[in-house]
């Protein structure tokens, strides 16, 4: 969430920066709510001053033994007006809060301007795509003989679900463990195991709610009866996590942490659940776009002045996984029109997918600035001992399923077998090749 003072100070400048990312700020709507808020607050202050003045008069009149009933009646009436004003102010403040929650983050000055993904800027490319001397198969055809079962996934849960069995299931598990070990043992992250179901406050904290509820899997939960609701049973909405970023980042929600505890660096392996609303017809074949997929997530909680450098370091950590697996990749900085809602700057890492003859996103690393921290009220005590908002960052390190796809396709052999990258062999008992079932 943006600082509302930015809008109050220079809303036109904010609107111009948001326009760069394709967002049209409702300037008139904000101005109208602000005018209403100011009018109510001014009237409230006038009423409070009048009540204070009358209260003093009551004391004087009673001190003289004179009748104060008329003045007391007026004070009582002012009290009723103040209650009504407070209720009106609550309504306006709630509308302002809803508006602020719907506004995306401001792009960092270093982010290139652009309309969409076609105007993202490549910053580096590593590895050379392999030249095959046989017809390339995609991961669906390769995986069928190795344990990838899309039909079983569809039978159990519907489209965009997959069952992994045997060798490919072991490979999937090995990838996740390899990623976690690299981030914790080499990159300095602390491993965390987090809930896969979170409350609405957590989703609001990281920015999924209220704007992106249709992308989430909601889990209504009966919470018993409450006196206020009579005979009705209270139902509270919980949500399956779309990424471990949500629980990891919310660890500092409503906290004031000591400066010497920063940076906090967490890594977690979890399933992720996404409804993929709006993606009908996209990537319908295979594991590229699933309702449930595994990911190793990195999250950092840092002091504001270090977040820019932390983003570069986090992106390098994600790239290191691909370097170790010897998979060709490229890294792009997203332009203003392609950035995520809460990000101030994002790098996407794209891995080479031979069957598609292109690079596909496998990681997204973002600096959120104080955008999430303001929503969560996550703070630290600065050098002056005053609470200050932290900065938060998150990045995929990596999406396990997409890494599996890239590995199967890049390391395939003419006979349908798949060579295991050297870095993964210790996680598979030294196995060097995955051989298709006969």
From Swiss-Prot:
GO cellular component, one term: cytoplasm
GO biological process, one term: selenocysteine biosynthetic process
PROSITE patterns, sorted: AA_TRNA_LIGASE_II
EC nos: 6.1.1.11
Gene3D superfamilies: Bira Bifunctional Protein, Domain 2, Serine-tRNA synthetase, tRNA binding domain
Catalytic activity: tRNA(Ser) + L-serine + ATP = L-seryl-tRNA(Ser) + AMP + diphosphate + H(+); tRNA(Sec) + L-serine + ATP = L-seryl-tRNA(Sec) + AMP + diphosphate + H(+)
Annotated binding of L-serine, by residue: 243-245, 297, 396
Single Gene Ontology MF annotation: ATP binding
Domain of life according to the entry: Bacteria
Annotated localization: Cytoplasm
Binding site for ATP: 274-276, 361-364
Pathway: Aminoacyl-tRNA biosynthesis; selenocysteinyl-tRNA(Sec) biosynthesis; L-seryl-tRNA(Sec) from L-serine and tRNA(Sec): step 1/1
Alphabetical keyword list: Aminoacyl-tRNA synthetase, ATP-binding, Cytoplasm, Ligase, Nucleotide-binding, Protein biosynthesis
Enzyme class: ligase
Entries under HAMAP family matching the protein: Ser_tRNA_synth_type1
Role played: Catalyzes the attachment of serine to tRNA(Ser). Is also able to aminoacylate tRNA(Sec) with serine, to form the misacylated tRNA L-seryl-tRNA(Sec), which will be further converted into selenocysteinyl-tRNA(Sec).
Domain comment, as recorded: Consists of two distinct domains, a catalytic core and a N-terminal extension that is involved in tRNA binding.
Quaternary assembly: Homodimer. The tRNA molecule binds across the dimer.
Record family assignment: Belongs to the class-II aminoacyl-tRNA synthetase family. Type-1 seryl-tRNA synthetase subfamily.
Protein name as annotated: Serine--tRNA ligase
Native species: Ralstonia pickettii (strain 12J)
């Amino acid at each position: 969430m943006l600082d509302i003072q930015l809008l109050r100070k220079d809303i036109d400048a904010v609107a111009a920066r948001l326009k760069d990312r394709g967002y049209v700020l409702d300037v008139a709507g904000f101005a109208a709510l602000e005018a209403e808020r100011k009018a109510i607050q001014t009237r409230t202050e006038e009423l409070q001053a009048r009540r204070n003045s009358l209260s003093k008069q009551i004391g004087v009149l009673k001190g003289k033994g004179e009748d104060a009933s008329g003045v007391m009646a007026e004070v009582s009436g002012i009290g009723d007006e103040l209650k009504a004003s407070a209720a009106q102010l609550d309504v306006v403040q709630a509308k302002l809060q809803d508006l602020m929650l719907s506004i995306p983050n401001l792009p960092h000055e270093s982010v290139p301007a652009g309309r969409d993904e076609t105007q993202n800027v490549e910053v580096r490319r590593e590895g050379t795509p392999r030249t095959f001397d046989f017809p390339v198969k995609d991961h669906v055809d390769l995986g069928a003989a190795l344990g990838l079962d899309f039909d079983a996934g569809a039978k159990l849960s519907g489209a965009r679900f997959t069952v992994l069995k045997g060798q490919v299931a072991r490979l999937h598990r090995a990838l996740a463990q390899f990623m976690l070990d690299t981030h914790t043992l080499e990159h300095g992250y602390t491993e965390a195991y987090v809930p896969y179901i979170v409350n609405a406050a957590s989703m609001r904290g990281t920015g999924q709610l209220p704007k992106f509820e249709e992308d989430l899997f909601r889990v209504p939960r009966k919470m018993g009866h409450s006196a206020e609701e009579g005979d009705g049973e209270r139902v509270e909405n919980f949500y399956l996590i779309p990424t471990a970023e949500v629980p990891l980042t919310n660890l500092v929600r409503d906290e004031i942490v000591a400066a010497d505890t920063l940076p906090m660096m967490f890594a977690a392996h979890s399933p992720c659940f996404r409804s993929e609303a709006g993606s009908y017809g996209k990537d319908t074949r295979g594991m590229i776009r699933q309702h449930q997929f595994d990911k190793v997530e990195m999250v950092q909680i840092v002091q504001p002045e270090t977040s820019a450098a932390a983003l570069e370091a986090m992106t390098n950590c994600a790239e290191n996984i691909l370097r170790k697996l010897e998979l060709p990749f490229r890294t792009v900085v997203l332009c203003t029109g392609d950035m995520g809602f809460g990000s101030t700057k994002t790098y996407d890492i794209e891995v080479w997918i031979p069957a598609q003859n292109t690079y596909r996103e496998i990681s997204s690393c973002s600096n959120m600035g104080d955008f999430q921290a303001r929503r969560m009220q996550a703070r630290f005590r600065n050098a002056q001992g005053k609470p200050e908002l932290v900065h938060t960052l998150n990045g995929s390190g990596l999406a396990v399923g997409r890494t599996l796809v890239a590995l199967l396709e890049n390391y395939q052999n003419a006979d349908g077998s798949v060579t295991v990258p050297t870095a993964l062999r210790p996680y598979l008992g030294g196995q060097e090749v995955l051989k298709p079932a006969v």
